Curated annotation (Swiss-Prot):
Pfam family name, one: DFP
Gene Ontology CC: phosphopantothenoylcysteine decarboxylase complex
Pathway: Cofactor biosynthesis; coenzyme A biosynthesis; CoA from (R)-pantothenate: step 2/5; Cofactor biosynthesis; coenzyme A biosynthesis; CoA from (R)-pantothenate: step 3/5
Record region (Phosphopantothenoylcysteine decarboxylase): 1-193
Protein's recorded name: Coenzyme A biosynthesis bifunctional protein CoaBC
Origin species: Synechocystis sp. (strain ATCC 27184 / PCC 6803 / Kazusa)
Binding site for CTP: D283, K293, P309, D310, L311, I312, F328, K342, K346
Reaction catalysed by this enzyme: N-[(R)-4-phosphopantothenoyl]-L-cysteine + H(+) = (R)-4'-phosphopantetheine + CO2; (R)-4'-phosphopantothenate + L-cysteine + CTP = N-[(R)-4-phosphopantothenoyl]-L-cysteine + CMP + diphosphate + H(+)
Metal-binding keyword on record: yes
Amino acid sequence: MVKGKRILIGVGGGIAAYKICEVVSQLFQQGAEVRVILTAEAEKFVTPLTFTTLARHPAYGDADFWQPIHHRPLHIDLGEWADIFLIAPLTAHTLAKLGHGFADDLLSNTVLASSCPILLAPAMNTDMWEQEAVQRNLQQLLGDRRYHLLAPNGGLLACDRRGVGRLAEPAQIMHRLQALLFTGGQEDLRGKRILITAGGTQEYLDAVRFIGNPSTGKMGLALAQSAGDRGARVTLIHGPIGDLPIPMGVISMAVVNAEQMEQALAQQAPLADWIVMAAAVADVKPAQTWTGKIAKQDLPDSLPLAPVPDLIAQVSKQKRPHQLLVGFAAQAGDIVTPAKEKLQRKNLDVIVANPIDQPQSGFGTDSNQAVIIDRHGSQTAIAPCSKLAMAHRIWQYLLERI
C-alpha cells in the first residue's frame, strides 16, 4: 500500500527517535520514497547519516535550510512533494511550535508549507503528556482536519517510570500510515460497530490432539486493524492466533472451539452494525472425547465425527434489518461458483471468496487475493496484495456498494 508513495518524516528530539529508523527501513523495503527532516535536537540522538543510509536519500537538518544549493526553497519543495507527513517522535516543544504556527526551523516551516495529511506520533514523559498546556496544544492542532493522532502507548519510559508516553511501535506507525494513505484521512467507519471473527477453531479429541485447520487469523486481524484505523468500534472474536498482537483499541474475545465461538457470537452479534465472519471454523468435531492423553496404542481405529454448529447460518437467521452480514469462502479451483451458492444458502449480504491453492494466498500468508460477491449479483476481483490492503478494499467496497 505504500509502494510509490512519497512519505516525509519529521524526527523530533527524543530518545524514541531510534524507533523511526525501523519505520524508514520498512517503508523503503516496501517501495516508498522517503525523505527525512531532523530537528537540531533529533540530531543529538540519531545522526542524519543513519537516515540517509536507510532512505537512500540525504536526510535534511536545519543547516540544509539555509544552503543556497536548492533550486527552490527547501521547505516549499518538501512540503509540496509529500503524499503524507509523519512527525515522530513529536515532542512537547515541537507540538507547542506547531500548535501556535511558529516557523523557526526546517521542520516547522515545512509543516506550514505542506497540504497533505499529517500523522502526529507523540512521545514524552507521562507528566509532560498530561499537562494542560500540552493537551491544549494538541487539541489546537487536531482541530485542523489534516492532522491525525497516533496516541502514545503505556509502559516503561526512558525516565524509569511507567505510564503513558511511549512512542507507538513501528508496526503501529506503519499500519496507521497505510490507513491514512488509503483513505486520505477520512474516518469513514466512525460510528460503526463492527464484529469480526478470525482464526481457526480447534475441536479436541483428547488433551493434546484436535481437529482444526491452518488458519492463523491474519486476515481477520487485518480487518480489525483497518476498521479501527478508519474509526470503527471493533470487537474481535478469535480462535488460537499464536503470538499475533491484537490491534490497539480492539475489544477481543479468545475462544478455542466452535461452541465457545457460538456463545460469544450470541452475546456480541445483536450489538453490531456489521458482522464479518472471517474465522475458519472446523466443520466437524470428534463424536467422543477423552480426558488426558490417549496412549497411541489405544487410539480408535476409526473416528466417528459430529457436526459443529453452523455459526454463520445461526447469525444469518438472527440478523436484524439494519445489520450487514459478510462471509468468507476459502476454496481451491473455481472459487466463484461455490461462493455464490454459499451466499444464497446462508442468506448473506456479501461473500469474499479467496483461493487456497495460489502462491502467497490463503492460510498463514501475509498476502491474499479474492473475489467479492454481493447479494445484488455484483462481483469485484481483488488482485494479489497484502492482507491489510485487502481489508481496506473490502471496507471500501462495503461503503460504496452496499
